[in-house]
Amino acid sequence: MSDNKQYRLVTRSDFDGLVCAILLKHINLVNDILFVHPKDMQDGIIAVGANDISTNLPFVDGVHIAFDHHHSETLRNEKKDNHIIDPEAPSAARVVYDYYGGTETFPASWESMMKAVDKGDSAQFDMEEVLHPKRWELLNFIMDSRTGLGRFRDFRISNYELMMDLIEFGKDHSINELLELPDVKERTELYFAHEEKFKAQIKRCATVHGNLVVLDLRDEEIIYSGNRFVIYALFPQCNISIHIMWGLKKQNTVFATGKSIFDRSSTTNVGELMLKYNGGGHNAAGTCQVPHEQNEACLAELISAINADS
């Protein structure tokens, strides 16, 4: 921090990425931001170098410094001095916050924001917050690309522009003020408009395999938007789920696997399981992408492995 050099932040376009950006801009470390998909980092599609700081993404050699909290990254990489990783941290933002001095460096008024990002990234929600989100929980869900709002409307501004606005606005405004921003309200209104259709779709497309619920959305013409934890509220008897979706331009099949946030008894290490199929994640959630011709065999293997762990 002493050389006054500024870097580009490479991160995810989600709530954790937003808070990482707010923290790093506060200490004048970043002057540019690039939002990327984690698999693009892992596959080397994103060109990064000594002028980049990455957060919440697979480690790529050559970056100035990388912050993360994904368990699978400790398995995939040898320990490096510029890879600041804490699998016990609830969010990548918390790793950044602690590394740069915590309360000695950052405003005390940000404590509610830090608690919210920790809660959001580690999914410490209760059933009421999942089924009827408000305040920080609602902001977290509308910023999560997996909620799927972007499929339905050309919003006044893009998600990138909204992220950039929230980075500036979020540092000195309350959550109630953030939710009153017209571009945020536009998204929350759509979220609530889809709420009941989303629940009905989950019930129609889900199949239960022991402790696992599999949601196959590939044949659905419209996939309604909604937060990714609703499935656990609708299937409380299951402690883990797999969402099956088309990959980009239907080039492959995506298996997005996550543990229930209400029944946390599953012993499967999802990140390690996904790593076997060139994916990744952490103990409680992860994804992999497989060629179409392998998807049936892969799904059968995943179901078998997850049921064996129960």
Kindly label every feature range from the protein language model.
Residues S145-K185:
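Long, charge-rich alpha-helical interaction segments
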Residues E168-L217:
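Active-site rim beta-loop-alpha module in soluble metabolic enzymes
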